[in-house]
Amino acid sequence: MRVVVQRAKDAKVTVAGEVVGEIDFGLVLLVGITHDDTEEDAAFVADKIAHLRIFEDEHGKMNVSLIDVGGAILSISQFTLYGDCRKGRRPNFMDAAKPEHAKHIYEAFNEQLRQKGIRVETGVFGAMMDVMLTNVGPVTLIVESK
């Protein structure tokens, strides 16, 4: 499992011109799933992200978590995170999970975050989406399960 984590002042995702998910403050997650990812991977990554100390404390030091600041998450499924660009000029997506498996793990991941008391907004799995955000910092990290 591979997740790009972006700290955001605000973010929204639209499908066919309609807003389907929106947050005011928190994290935007681009979530990629590979073939052998499990619900345990989803739980590990969800816990890691929920407790990452990437928000500033009163001294301006990155020292508090999303849970500490009461932020929300905009979670977007993105199979292209497993695109292999080493050969040729066209990415190979063979490492991305099949849609049925990916959707199951993606939904389990979002549920793990919700169980921690985090408000989670999502896009539409498998849809063409427009994602807009204001990245604060900017702070962008990659969290992987393996």
Swiss-Prot record:
A GO molecular function term, named singly, is: Gly-tRNA(Ala) deacylase activity
Q: Which domain of life is it from?
A: Bacteria
The protein's matches in InterPro entries, at most eight in alphabetical order, are given as: Daa-tRNA_deacyls_DTD, DTD-like_sf
Q: What class of enzyme is it?
A: hydrolase
**GO cellular component labels:** cytoplasm
Query: Where does the motif Gly-cisPro motif, important for rejection of L-amino acids lie?
Result: 137-138
Q: Which UniProt keywords apply?
A: Cytoplasm, Hydrolase, RNA-binding, tRNA-binding
Q: Does the keyword tRNA-binding apply?
A: yes
Question: Could you say which EC number(s) this protein's record lists?
Answer: 3.1.1.96
The UniProt catalytic activity note for this protein reads: glycyl-tRNA(Ala) + H2O = tRNA(Ala) + glycine + H(+); a D-aminoacyl-tRNA + H2O = a tRNA + a D-alpha-amino acid + H(+)
Q: What is known of its domains?
A: A Gly-cisPro motif from one monomer fits into the active site of the other monomer to allow specific chiral rejection of L-amino acids.
Q: Which family does it belong to?
A: Belongs to the DTD family.
Subunit structure and binding partners: Homodimer.
Report the protein's function: An aminoacyl-tRNA editing enzyme that deacylates mischarged D-aminoacyl-tRNAs. Also deacylates mischarged glycyl-tRNA(Ala), protecting cells against glycine mischarging by AlaRS. Acts via tRNA-based rather than protein-based catalysis; rejects L-amino acids rather than detecting D-amino acids in the active site. By recycling D-aminoacyl-tRNA to D-amino acids and free tRNA molecules, this enzyme counteracts the toxicity associated with the formation of D-aminoacyl-tRNA entities in vivo and helps enforce protein L-homochirality.
What's the protein called, per UniProt? D-aminoacyl-tRNA deacylase
Annotated source species: Anoxybacillus flavithermus (strain DSM 21510 / WK1)
Query: What gene does this protein come from?
Result: dtd
